[in-house]
Amino acid sequence: MMNLNLLLSKPCQASTTRNELETGSSDACPRTIFIFARGSTEAGNMGALVGPFTANALESAYGASNVWVQGVGGPYTAGLVENALPAGTSQAAIREAQRLFNLAASKCPNTPITAGGYSQGAAVMSNAIPGLSAAVQDQIKGVVLFGYTKNLQNGGRIPNFPTSKTTIYCETGDLVCNGTLIITPAHLLYSDEAAVQAPTFLRAQIDSA
């Protein structure tokens, strides 16, 4: 089971909320849209441990006005108990992520969509994406998952989605990647991958789209 004390012992970092997809105009579509689902107990709709690092790197590469960053919030409350559900998160969270992907495709049908998820947020993405239409899946050019809680169960991939469009980061010693819900210190150490390797992969996917 989850070690809540260890999870909450991580020093507090500023959380972030981003809603450019929700507020952006279809008349000013960006170079890419980045949709991210935070980990359990993280505040805002982006969290602070992973998502903002990747978002900031994409903005540095393309310019802030050329990247819409959108966190999965609302019905996705990122509670701890939802990790124990069969999908590793709630159906409401999955539907909310799907709504955002569909919104991106309808607002900006020619814009490459990228996405990411951390911990429970990785489960949100791995459940949401397979349920999208083929057209929307095709518009998703790259997905990065960190501390993937369904990594073992899903064979190290997003079901029914190209592995060439997916990169999964699992730190040595992060036991959630081995099919458990045991939180070890390694589960909190993805900032480097989020800041460098993940955006590098996403940029390559965007630029080749």
Swiss-Prot record:
Modification(s) after translation: The 2 disulfide bonds play a critical role in holding the catalytic residues in juxta-position; reduction of the disulfide bridges results in the complete inactivation of the enzyme.
Family: Belongs to the cutinase family.
MF annotations from Gene Ontology: cutinase activity
Active site: S119, D174, H187
Biological process annotations from GO: carbohydrate catabolic process
Protein name from the UniProt record: Cutinase
Keywords: Disulfide bond, Hydrolase, Secreted, Serine esterase, Signal, Virulence
Protein purpose: Catalyzes the hydrolysis of complex carboxylic polyesters found in the cell wall of plants. Degrades cutin, a macromolecule that forms the structure of the plant cuticle. Allows pathogenic fungi to penetrate through the cuticular barrier into the host plant during the initial stage of fungal infection.
Localization per record: Secreted
EC number: 3.1.1.74
Highest taxon above the source species: Eukaryota
Pfam entry (one): Cutinase
Coiled-coil residue windows: none
Residues with site note (Transition state stabilizer): S40, Q120
Disulfide bonds: C29-C108, C170-C177
GO CC field: extracellular region
Main location: secreted
Catalytic activity entry: cutin + H2O = cutin monomers
Top-tier EC class: hydrolase
